[in-house]
Amino acid sequence: MKKVKVFEKVQNIVVEKLGIEPEKVTPIASFTRDLGADSLDTLELIVALEETFNIEISNQATTKLVTIQHTIDYISQQLEVDVELAN
């Protein structure tokens, strides 16, 4: 999956879960600082991302997913690993 598609899916999830405008969901946006997510919002976002992309995001990884771009990069990396393992 291309990063553009990953971004679009992440953006849709963030817009739905946080109730914000799509324009606010930029690669450099911080979930907490810029988008106003609290700890419960973050948990809901993680669960939605795991279900949407069929991946598991470890507790350790969640602490590193500070911005939209961090999240896109992490998901893209996980999807590439899954594709490699399937071959």
Per-region residue spans from a language model:
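Phosphopantetheine-dependent thiolation modules in NRPS/PKS and related acyl-activating systems
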Residues: 2-37, 46, 51-87
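Two-component histidine kinase catalytic core, primarily the HATPase_c
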Residues: 41
